[in-house]
Amino acid sequence: MTLPEPLFRMEGISKRYGGAVALKDADIAIRPGAIHAVLGENGAGKSTLIKIMAGVVAPDEGRMLLDGKEIAFASPAAANAAGIVCVFQELSLIPDLSVADNIVISNPPLKFGMIDRRRQRRIAEEALARAGASDIHPSALVKDLPLSRRQMVEIAKALARKPRLMILDEATSALTQSDVEKVFTMLKRLRAEGMALIYISHRMHEIAQLADECTVFRNGRSIESYPAGTKTDQQVVELMIGREYSNVFPPKPAHRGEVMPVLSCRDLSWGDRLSGITFDIRPGEIIGVGGLDGQGQRELLLALFGVLRDVKGEVVIDGRPVTLKSPRDAKSGGISMALIPEDRKTEGLMLPMTVRENLSIAALDRVSRNGVIDRAAERREIDDLFKLLAIKAATIDMPVAALSGGNQQKVVIAKWLMNRPRIILLNDPTRGIDVGTKQEIYLLLRKLADAGAAIIFYSTDYDELIGCCDRVLVMYDGSIIRQLEGAEINEHELIGAALNIAGDHAAQRIAP
Protein backbone atom coordinates (compact mmCIF):
# COMPACT_ATOMS: atom_id res chain seq x y z
CA MET A 1 0.00 0.00 0.00
CA THR A 2 1.35 3.43 -0.98
CA LEU A 3 1.68 5.75 1.99
CA PRO A 4 0.29 9.28 1.65
CA GLU A 5 2.71 12.18 1.43
CA PRO A 6 3.53 13.79 4.78
CA LEU A 7 1.24 16.57 5.89
CA PHE A 8 3.99 18.06 8.04
CA ARG A 9 7.74 17.64 7.89
CA MET A 10 10.71 18.92 9.92
CA GLU A 11 14.19 18.75 8.39
CA GLY A 12 17.53 19.43 10.08
CA ILE A 13 15.96 21.19 13.07
CA SER A 14 18.40 22.44 15.71
CA LYS A 15 17.80 24.48 18.86
CA ARG A 16 20.18 25.70 21.55
CA TYR A 17 19.52 27.31 24.91
CA GLY A 18 22.73 29.12 25.80
CA GLY A 19 25.42 26.47 25.60
CA ALA A 20 22.98 23.55 25.91
CA VAL A 21 21.92 21.76 22.73
CA ALA A 22 18.24 20.78 22.93
CA LEU A 23 17.88 19.57 19.32
CA LYS A 24 20.52 18.76 16.69
CA ASP A 25 19.67 18.02 13.03
CA ALA A 26 16.32 16.47 13.96
CA ASP A 27 14.03 15.09 11.23
CA ILE A 28 10.46 13.84 11.39
CA ALA A 29 7.62 13.36 8.88
CA ILE A 30 3.96 13.21 9.94
CA ARG A 31 1.36 11.69 7.62
CA PRO A 32 -2.40 12.35 7.55
CA GLY A 33 -4.60 9.56 8.88
CA ALA A 34 -1.83 8.17 11.08
CA ILE A 35 -0.76 8.24 14.72
CA HIS A 36 2.96 8.97 14.97
CA ALA A 37 4.55 8.13 18.33
CA VAL A 38 7.56 10.17 19.48
CA LEU A 39 9.68 8.30 22.02
CA GLY A 40 12.69 9.22 24.11
CA GLU A 41 13.93 9.79 27.62
CA ASN A 42 13.20 13.04 29.42
CA GLY A 43 15.73 15.50 28.04
CA ALA A 44 15.89 13.73 24.66
CA GLY A 45 14.45 16.77 22.87
CA LYS A 46 10.78 15.81 22.57
CA SER A 47 9.46 18.85 24.42
CA THR A 48 11.58 21.26 22.39
CA LEU A 49 10.46 19.52 19.20
CA ILE A 50 6.76 20.01 19.89
CA LYS A 51 7.29 23.55 21.15
CA ILE A 52 8.81 24.37 17.77
CA MET A 53 5.91 22.64 15.98
CA ALA A 54 3.40 24.57 18.08
CA GLY A 55 5.05 27.96 17.56
CA VAL A 56 6.14 28.36 21.19
CA VAL A 57 9.83 28.69 20.24
CA ALA A 58 11.62 29.15 16.92
CA PRO A 59 14.33 26.78 15.65
CA ASP A 60 17.91 28.05 15.22
CA GLU A 61 18.43 25.93 12.10
CA GLY A 62 16.41 23.74 9.76
CA ARG A 63 13.03 24.10 8.14
CA MET A 64 9.39 23.03 8.51
CA LEU A 65 7.05 22.16 5.67
CA LEU A 66 3.24 22.00 5.70
CA ASP A 67 1.60 20.52 2.59
CA GLY A 68 5.05 20.64 0.98
CA LYS A 69 5.44 24.40 1.51
CA GLU A 70 8.02 25.88 3.86
CA ILE A 71 6.49 27.63 6.87
CA ALA A 72 7.53 29.36 10.09
CA PHE A 73 5.41 30.16 13.13
CA ALA A 74 5.92 33.39 15.05
CA SER A 75 3.52 32.33 17.81
CA PRO A 76 1.21 29.53 18.96
CA ALA A 77 -1.67 31.49 17.43
CA ALA A 78 0.05 31.26 14.03
CA ALA A 79 0.47 27.49 14.43
CA ASN A 80 -3.18 27.14 15.47
CA ALA A 81 -4.27 29.13 12.43
CA ALA A 82 -2.32 26.68 10.26
CA GLY A 83 -4.17 23.78 11.91
CA ILE A 84 -1.45 22.62 14.34
CA VAL A 85 -2.66 22.31 17.93
CA CYS A 86 -0.83 20.86 20.93
CA VAL A 87 -2.17 19.40 24.17
CA PHE A 88 0.80 20.00 26.45
CA GLN A 89 1.57 17.97 29.58
CA GLU A 90 1.24 21.19 31.60
CA LEU A 91 -2.41 22.24 31.52
CA SER A 92 -3.20 25.67 30.08
CA LEU A 93 -6.67 26.01 31.61
CA ILE A 94 -7.69 29.00 33.74
CA PRO A 95 -9.08 27.53 36.99
CA ASP A 96 -11.53 30.33 37.82
CA LEU A 97 -13.26 30.22 34.42
CA SER A 98 -15.91 27.75 33.32
CA VAL A 99 -15.22 24.77 31.09
CA ALA A 100 -16.96 26.51 28.18
CA ASP A 101 -14.99 29.73 28.69
CA ASN A 102 -11.73 27.78 28.58
CA ILE A 103 -12.66 25.81 25.48
CA VAL A 104 -13.40 28.90 23.35
CA ILE A 105 -10.97 31.29 25.04
CA SER A 106 -8.78 31.83 21.97
CA ASN A 107 -11.71 32.52 19.64
CA PRO A 108 -14.99 33.17 21.51
CA PRO A 109 -18.17 33.37 19.39
CA LEU A 110 -19.46 36.94 19.23
CA LYS A 111 -22.87 38.48 18.67
CA PHE A 112 -23.26 42.25 18.51
CA GLY A 113 -19.73 42.58 19.91
CA MET A 114 -20.44 40.40 22.96
CA ILE A 115 -19.83 36.73 23.65
CA ASP A 116 -22.70 34.60 22.36
CA ARG A 117 -23.20 32.38 25.41
CA ARG A 118 -25.66 30.02 23.72
CA ARG A 119 -23.29 29.35 20.82
CA GLN A 120 -20.34 29.10 23.22
CA ARG A 121 -22.14 26.39 25.17
CA ARG A 122 -22.98 24.52 21.96
CA ILE A 123 -19.34 24.62 20.82
CA ALA A 124 -18.20 23.36 24.23
CA GLU A 125 -20.76 20.54 24.28
CA GLU A 126 -19.71 19.41 20.80
CA ALA A 127 -16.01 19.50 21.69
CA LEU A 128 -16.55 17.62 24.95
CA ALA A 129 -18.64 14.98 23.17
CA ARG A 130 -15.95 14.57 20.52
CA ALA A 131 -13.38 14.09 23.29
CA GLY A 132 -15.56 11.45 24.96
CA ALA A 133 -16.23 13.72 27.94
CA SER A 134 -19.88 14.67 27.49
CA ASP A 135 -20.42 14.06 31.23
CA ILE A 136 -18.52 17.29 32.00
CA HIS A 137 -20.92 20.25 32.29
CA PRO A 138 -19.86 23.28 30.22
CA SER A 139 -20.80 25.61 33.08
CA ALA A 140 -18.63 23.84 35.67
CA LEU A 141 -15.65 25.79 36.99
CA VAL A 142 -12.36 24.18 36.03
CA LYS A 143 -11.04 24.54 39.61
CA ASP A 144 -13.84 22.25 40.82
CA LEU A 145 -12.81 19.40 38.50
CA PRO A 146 -10.32 16.67 39.44
CA LEU A 147 -7.06 16.53 37.48
CA SER A 148 -8.23 13.75 35.15
CA ARG A 149 -11.33 15.70 34.09
CA ARG A 150 -9.27 18.86 33.54
CA GLN A 151 -7.11 16.89 31.15
CA MET A 152 -10.22 15.88 29.18
CA VAL A 153 -11.25 19.55 28.98
CA GLU A 154 -7.77 20.35 27.64
CA ILE A 155 -8.26 17.79 24.88
CA ALA A 156 -11.73 19.15 24.10
CA LYS A 157 -10.24 22.66 23.91
CA ALA A 158 -7.77 21.44 21.29
CA LEU A 159 -10.50 19.71 19.26
CA ALA A 160 -12.63 22.86 19.27
CA ARG A 161 -9.90 24.49 17.16
CA LYS A 162 -10.52 21.90 14.41
CA PRO A 163 -6.87 20.89 13.95
CA ARG A 164 -5.31 19.12 10.97
CA LEU A 165 -2.41 18.00 13.15
CA MET A 166 -2.95 17.41 16.87
CA ILE A 167 -0.04 16.78 19.24
CA LEU A 168 -0.65 15.03 22.56
CA ASP A 169 2.17 15.27 25.11
CA GLU A 170 1.68 12.67 27.87
CA ALA A 171 -2.05 13.34 27.55
CA THR A 172 -3.07 10.21 29.46
CA SER A 173 -0.63 10.43 32.39
CA ALA A 174 -3.21 12.04 34.69
CA LEU A 175 -6.27 10.16 33.41
CA THR A 176 -8.30 7.38 34.98
CA GLN A 177 -8.39 4.10 33.06
CA SER A 178 -11.93 4.89 31.91
CA ASP A 179 -10.82 8.22 30.45
CA VAL A 180 -7.76 6.60 28.85
CA GLU A 181 -10.05 4.22 26.98
CA LYS A 182 -12.20 7.15 25.82
CA VAL A 183 -9.13 9.00 24.56
CA PHE A 184 -7.95 5.90 22.67
CA THR A 185 -11.37 5.56 21.02
CA MET A 186 -11.29 9.25 20.10
CA LEU A 187 -7.78 9.04 18.61
CA LYS A 188 -8.69 6.04 16.48
CA ARG A 189 -11.78 7.88 15.23
CA LEU A 190 -9.76 11.01 14.40
CA ARG A 191 -7.21 8.88 12.56
CA ALA A 192 -10.00 7.32 10.51
CA GLU A 193 -11.22 10.83 9.68
CA GLY A 194 -7.79 11.64 8.23
CA MET A 195 -6.31 13.76 11.01
CA ALA A 196 -2.55 13.61 11.58
CA LEU A 197 -1.67 12.84 15.20
CA ILE A 198 1.53 12.95 17.22
CA TYR A 199 1.45 10.94 20.43
CA ILE A 200 4.12 11.28 23.12
CA SER A 201 4.05 8.77 25.96
CA HIS A 202 6.42 6.76 28.15
CA ARG A 203 3.84 3.97 28.35
CA MET A 204 5.00 1.34 25.89
CA HIS A 205 1.70 -0.54 25.92
CA GLU A 206 -0.10 2.62 24.79
CA ILE A 207 2.33 3.04 21.89
CA ALA A 208 1.79 -0.59 20.88
CA GLN A 209 -1.98 -0.14 20.96
CA LEU A 210 -2.17 3.15 19.06
CA ALA A 211 0.81 4.00 16.89
CA ASP A 212 1.24 3.51 13.15
CA GLU A 213 4.74 5.00 12.96
CA CYS A 214 7.39 5.77 15.58
CA THR A 215 10.42 8.04 15.87
CA VAL A 216 12.96 7.69 18.67
CA PHE A 217 14.91 10.69 19.98
CA ARG A 218 18.07 10.60 22.07
CA ASN A 219 20.28 13.49 23.22
CA GLY A 220 18.47 15.92 20.92
CA ARG A 221 18.79 13.81 17.77
CA SER A 222 16.22 11.78 15.85
CA ILE A 223 17.78 8.31 16.06
CA GLU A 224 15.41 6.17 13.98
CA SER A 225 11.92 6.14 12.48
CA TYR A 226 10.19 2.81 11.91
CA PRO A 227 6.71 1.27 11.41
CA ALA A 228 5.01 0.46 14.71
CA GLY A 229 5.17 -3.20 15.69
CA THR A 230 8.50 -3.91 13.97
CA LYS A 231 10.63 -3.69 17.13
CA THR A 232 10.38 -5.27 20.56
CA ASP A 233 9.98 -3.10 23.65
CA GLN A 234 13.55 -3.92 24.65
CA GLN A 235 14.90 -2.83 21.25
CA VAL A 236 12.96 0.44 21.49
CA VAL A 237 14.21 1.16 25.00
CA GLU A 238 17.80 0.45 23.95
CA LEU A 239 17.39 2.97 21.10
CA MET A 240 16.07 5.50 23.63
CA ILE A 241 18.82 5.12 26.23
CA GLY A 242 21.72 4.15 23.96
CA ARG A 243 22.70 1.10 25.95
CA GLU A 244 21.56 -2.43 26.68
CA TYR A 245 18.43 -2.47 28.80
CA SER A 246 18.35 -5.27 31.34
CA ASN A 247 17.83 -5.83 35.05
CA VAL A 248 15.23 -3.06 35.18
CA PHE A 249 14.48 -3.72 38.85
CA PRO A 250 17.17 -4.31 41.48
CA PRO A 251 17.15 -7.71 43.19
CA LYS A 252 15.00 -8.06 46.28
CA PRO A 253 16.75 -9.02 49.51
CA ALA A 254 16.26 -12.30 51.30
CA HIS A 255 13.84 -12.33 54.22
CA ARG A 256 15.30 -10.03 56.89
CA GLY A 257 13.89 -11.86 59.90
CA GLU A 258 11.67 -10.45 62.59
CA VAL A 259 12.30 -6.78 63.31
CA MET A 260 10.06 -4.45 65.28
CA PRO A 261 7.82 -2.43 62.94
CA VAL A 262 8.79 1.20 62.52
CA LEU A 263 5.17 2.04 61.65
CA SER A 264 1.91 0.26 62.42
CA CYS A 265 -1.64 1.22 61.46
CA ARG A 266 -4.56 -0.08 63.51
CA ASP A 267 -8.08 0.23 62.11
CA LEU A 268 -7.40 3.54 60.33
CA SER A 269 -10.59 5.09 58.92
CA TRP A 270 -11.55 8.42 57.35
CA GLY A 271 -15.10 9.25 56.31
CA ASP A 272 -16.24 6.90 53.56
CA ARG A 273 -12.82 6.81 51.88
CA LEU A 274 -10.81 4.67 54.33
CA SER A 275 -12.07 1.78 56.43
CA GLY A 276 -10.27 -0.50 58.88
CA ILE A 277 -6.75 -0.03 57.47
CA THR A 278 -4.39 -2.28 59.45
CA PHE A 279 -0.79 -3.15 58.54
CA ASP A 280 2.83 -3.01 59.75
CA ILE A 281 6.00 -1.95 57.95
CA ARG A 282 9.53 -2.68 59.14
CA PRO A 283 12.84 -0.93 58.46
CA GLY A 284 14.27 -2.01 55.10
CA GLU A 285 10.91 -2.96 53.59
CA ILE A 286 9.29 -1.61 50.43
CA ILE A 287 5.55 -2.14 50.68
CA GLY A 288 3.49 -1.51 47.57
CA VAL A 289 -0.06 -0.20 47.61
CA GLY A 290 -2.09 -1.43 44.66
CA GLY A 291 -5.64 -1.72 43.39
CA LEU A 292 -7.69 0.18 40.86
CA ASP A 293 -7.10 3.92 40.93
CA GLY A 294 -9.30 5.82 43.37
CA GLN A 295 -9.77 3.09 45.99
CA GLY A 296 -8.36 5.16 48.85
CA GLN A 297 -4.64 4.74 48.17
CA ARG A 298 -3.89 8.47 48.03
CA GLU A 299 -6.06 9.12 51.07
CA LEU A 300 -4.07 6.51 53.00
CA LEU A 301 -0.81 8.32 52.27
CA LEU A 302 -2.34 11.70 53.15
CA ALA A 303 -3.75 10.30 56.40
CA LEU A 304 -0.36 8.92 57.41
CA PHE A 305 1.29 12.25 56.61
CA GLY A 306 -1.12 14.23 58.78
CA VAL A 307 -2.86 16.05 55.91
CA LEU A 308 -6.39 14.75 56.58
CA ARG A 309 -8.50 15.85 59.53
CA ASP A 310 -10.64 13.62 61.76
CA VAL A 311 -8.84 10.37 60.92
CA LYS A 312 -9.94 7.54 63.23
CA GLY A 313 -7.81 4.65 64.43
CA GLU A 314 -4.25 4.42 65.70
CA VAL A 315 -0.81 5.04 64.20
CA VAL A 316 2.11 3.54 66.10
CA ILE A 317 5.74 4.59 65.55
CA ASP A 318 8.48 2.44 67.10
CA GLY A 319 5.88 0.82 69.35
CA ARG A 320 4.55 4.15 70.61
CA PRO A 321 1.12 5.57 69.60
CA VAL A 322 1.43 9.00 67.98
CA THR A 323 -0.99 11.72 66.89
CA LEU A 324 -0.49 13.10 63.38
CA LYS A 325 -2.46 16.32 63.20
CA SER A 326 -0.34 17.95 60.50
CA PRO A 327 2.57 17.31 58.12
CA ARG A 328 4.76 19.11 60.66
CA ASP A 329 3.98 16.31 63.14
CA ALA A 330 4.82 13.67 60.51
CA LYS A 331 8.13 15.34 59.62
CA SER A 332 9.18 15.86 63.25
CA GLY A 333 12.39 14.27 64.48
CA GLY A 334 10.72 11.50 66.44
CA ILE A 335 8.78 10.30 63.39
CA SER A 336 10.83 11.58 60.42
CA MET A 337 8.37 10.90 57.59
CA ALA A 338 8.41 12.21 54.00
CA LEU A 339 5.72 12.25 51.30
CA ILE A 340 6.75 12.37 47.63
CA PRO A 341 3.62 13.88 46.00
CA GLU A 342 1.88 12.82 42.80
CA ASP A 343 1.99 16.12 40.90
CA ARG A 344 5.54 17.44 40.95
CA LYS A 345 4.66 20.74 39.27
CA THR A 346 1.90 21.87 41.64
CA GLU A 347 2.61 19.92 44.84
CA GLY A 348 6.32 19.15 44.78
CA LEU A 349 8.17 22.15 43.35
CA MET A 350 8.17 25.93 43.24
CA LEU A 351 8.88 26.21 39.53
CA PRO A 352 10.09 29.85 39.34
CA MET A 353 12.66 29.21 42.10
CA THR A 354 16.09 27.67 41.62
CA VAL A 355 17.06 24.06 42.19
CA ARG A 356 19.05 25.13 45.26
CA GLU A 357 16.14 27.07 46.75
CA ASN A 358 13.72 24.18 46.19
CA LEU A 359 16.05 21.78 47.98
CA SER A 360 17.09 24.04 50.85
CA ILE A 361 13.63 25.24 51.80
CA ALA A 362 12.67 21.71 52.85
CA ALA A 363 15.61 21.43 55.26
CA LEU A 364 16.36 24.88 56.61
CA ASP A 365 17.07 23.44 60.07
CA ARG A 366 19.82 21.22 58.64
CA VAL A 367 21.55 23.91 56.59
CA SER A 368 21.13 26.90 58.92
CA ARG A 369 23.20 28.15 61.83
CA ASN A 370 21.57 30.64 64.21
CA GLY A 371 18.85 31.39 61.68
CA VAL A 372 21.27 32.02 58.79
CA ILE A 373 21.81 29.57 55.93
CA ASP A 374 25.29 28.05 56.05
CA ARG A 375 26.14 28.07 52.34
CA ALA A 376 28.98 25.56 52.73
CA ALA A 377 26.75 23.08 54.58
CA GLU A 378 23.97 23.68 52.07
CA ARG A 379 26.31 23.00 49.17
CA ARG A 380 27.61 19.78 50.74
CA GLU A 381 24.08 18.46 51.27
CA ILE A 382 23.01 19.35 47.73
CA ASP A 383 26.16 17.92 46.14
CA ASP A 384 25.63 14.63 47.99
CA LEU A 385 22.05 14.38 46.73
CA PHE A 386 23.03 15.32 43.18
CA LYS A 387 25.45 12.39 43.18
CA LEU A 388 22.99 10.01 44.83
CA LEU A 389 20.19 10.76 42.36
CA ALA A 390 22.35 11.58 39.30
CA ILE A 391 20.47 14.87 38.80
CA LYS A 392 21.41 16.56 35.53
CA ALA A 393 21.42 20.36 35.83
CA ALA A 394 23.85 22.91 34.43
CA THR A 395 23.92 24.67 37.82
CA ILE A 396 22.02 24.49 41.10
CA ASP A 397 21.08 28.13 40.60
CA MET A 398 19.06 27.52 37.42
CA PRO A 399 15.23 27.60 37.64
CA VAL A 400 13.88 24.15 38.40
CA ALA A 401 11.28 24.74 35.66
CA ALA A 402 14.10 24.53 33.09
CA LEU A 403 14.90 20.90 33.98
CA SER A 404 13.48 17.91 32.13
CA GLY A 405 10.53 16.13 33.75
CA GLY A 406 12.70 13.28 34.98
CA ASN A 407 15.20 15.60 36.62
CA GLN A 408 12.39 17.65 38.17
CA GLN A 409 11.09 14.46 39.76
CA LYS A 410 14.56 13.68 41.08
CA VAL A 411 14.66 17.15 42.66
CA VAL A 412 11.30 16.45 44.36
CA ILE A 413 12.73 13.24 45.81
CA ALA A 414 15.99 14.95 46.78
CA LYS A 415 14.06 17.72 48.51
CA TRP A 416 12.47 15.22 50.88
CA LEU A 417 15.68 13.25 51.36
CA MET A 418 17.38 16.42 52.67
CA ASN A 419 15.82 15.61 56.06
CA ARG A 420 17.02 11.98 56.09
CA PRO A 421 13.52 10.48 56.59
CA ARG A 422 13.06 7.04 58.14
CA ILE A 423 9.62 6.51 56.59
CA ILE A 424 9.08 7.45 52.94
CA LEU A 425 5.63 7.62 51.32
CA LEU A 426 5.53 7.75 47.52
CA ASN A 427 2.43 8.67 45.52
CA ASP A 428 2.87 7.29 41.97
CA PRO A 429 6.38 8.83 41.74
CA THR A 430 7.28 7.66 38.22
CA ARG A 431 4.16 8.90 36.43
CA GLY A 432 5.09 10.70 33.22
CA ILE A 433 8.86 10.13 33.33
CA ASP A 434 11.10 8.15 31.01
CA VAL A 435 12.21 4.55 31.41
CA GLY A 436 15.84 5.42 32.17
CA THR A 437 14.90 7.73 35.03
CA LYS A 438 12.38 5.18 36.31
CA GLN A 439 15.14 2.59 36.52
CA GLU A 440 17.31 5.03 38.49
CA ILE A 441 14.44 5.66 40.92
CA TYR A 442 13.89 1.91 41.42
CA LEU A 443 17.59 1.50 42.27
CA LEU A 444 17.43 4.48 44.64
CA LEU A 445 14.41 3.09 46.51
CA ARG A 446 16.15 -0.23 47.09
CA LYS A 447 19.31 1.57 48.20
CA LEU A 448 17.31 3.64 50.70
CA ALA A 449 15.55 0.52 51.97
CA ASP A 450 18.87 -1.31 52.34
CA ALA A 451 20.04 1.64 54.45
CA GLY A 452 17.07 1.11 56.79
CA ALA A 453 14.26 3.28 55.40
CA ALA A 454 10.69 1.96 55.45
CA ILE A 455 9.02 2.75 52.11
CA ILE A 456 5.31 2.74 51.25
CA PHE A 457 4.98 2.92 47.47
CA TYR A 458 1.65 3.56 45.72
CA SER A 459 1.81 2.92 41.98
CA THR A 460 -0.71 2.54 39.17
CA ASP A 461 1.88 0.48 37.26
CA TYR A 462 1.62 -3.23 38.06
CA ASP A 463 5.14 -3.88 36.75
CA GLU A 464 6.52 -1.51 39.41
CA LEU A 465 4.62 -3.23 42.19
CA ILE A 466 5.84 -6.62 40.97
CA GLY A 467 9.45 -5.56 40.44
CA CYS A 468 10.05 -3.22 43.39
CA CYS A 469 7.98 -4.35 46.34
CA ASP A 470 8.58 -6.92 49.08
CA ARG A 471 4.85 -6.98 49.85
CA VAL A 472 1.81 -5.45 48.15
CA LEU A 473 -1.36 -4.30 49.93
CA VAL A 474 -4.27 -4.26 47.48
CA MET A 475 -7.02 -1.75 48.25
CA TYR A 476 -10.67 -1.91 47.22
CA ASP A 477 -13.35 0.58 48.26
CA GLY A 478 -11.17 2.10 50.98
CA SER A 479 -10.07 -1.18 52.58
CA ILE A 480 -7.04 -3.45 52.27
CA ILE A 481 -8.57 -6.65 50.97
CA ARG A 482 -5.45 -8.61 50.11
CA GLN A 483 -1.77 -8.81 50.99
CA LEU A 484 0.53 -10.37 48.40
CA GLU A 485 4.00 -11.69 49.18
CA GLY A 486 6.75 -13.50 47.30
CA ALA A 487 5.54 -15.41 44.24
CA GLU A 488 1.99 -14.13 44.84
CA ILE A 489 3.09 -10.71 43.58
CA ASN A 490 2.21 -11.23 39.92
CA GLU A 491 -0.09 -9.56 37.43
CA HIS A 492 -2.79 -12.23 37.66
CA GLU A 493 -3.09 -11.95 41.44
CA LEU A 494 -2.86 -8.14 41.39
CA ILE A 495 -5.65 -7.77 38.85
CA GLY A 496 -7.84 -10.35 40.54
CA ALA A 497 -7.45 -8.65 43.91
CA ALA A 498 -7.94 -5.17 42.40
CA LEU A 499 -11.28 -6.33 40.98
CA ASN A 500 -12.13 -8.00 44.32
CA ILE A 501 -12.20 -11.41 42.67
CA ALA A 502 -11.09 -14.27 44.92
CA GLY A 503 -8.27 -16.19 43.27
CA ASP A 504 -6.26 -19.01 44.75
CA HIS A 505 -6.60 -17.26 48.10
CA ALA A 506 -9.90 -15.84 49.25
CA ALA A 507 -9.95 -12.06 49.44
CA GLN A 508 -9.88 -11.01 53.04
CA ARG A 509 -9.15 -7.96 55.15
CA ILE A 510 -5.56 -7.98 56.28
CA ALA A 511 -4.46 -8.09 59.88
CA PRO A 512 -0.79 -8.31 60.80
Curated annotation (Swiss-Prot):
The keyword Cell membrane applies. Residues 8-244, 254-502 form the ABC transporter domain. It is an enzyme of class 7 (translocase). One of its GO terms (cellular component) is plasma membrane. It is a peripheral membrane protein. The keyword Metal-binding does not apply. Disulfide bonds: none annotated. Part of the ABC transporter complex RbsABC involved in ribose import. Responsible for energy coupling to the transport system. PANTHER family: CARBOHYDRATE TRANSPORT ATP-BINDING PROTEIN MG119-RELATED (PTHR43790), GALACTOFURANOSE TRANSPORTER ATP-BINDING PROTEIN YTFR (PTHR43790:SF9). Belongs to the ABC transporter superfamily. Ribose importer (TC 3.A.1.2.1) family. This is Ribose import ATP-binding protein RbsA 1. It comes from Rhizobium johnstonii (strain DSM 114642 / LMG 32736 / 3841). The lineage of its organism: Bacteria, Pseudomonadati, Pseudomonadota, Alphaproteobacteria, Hyphomicrobiales.
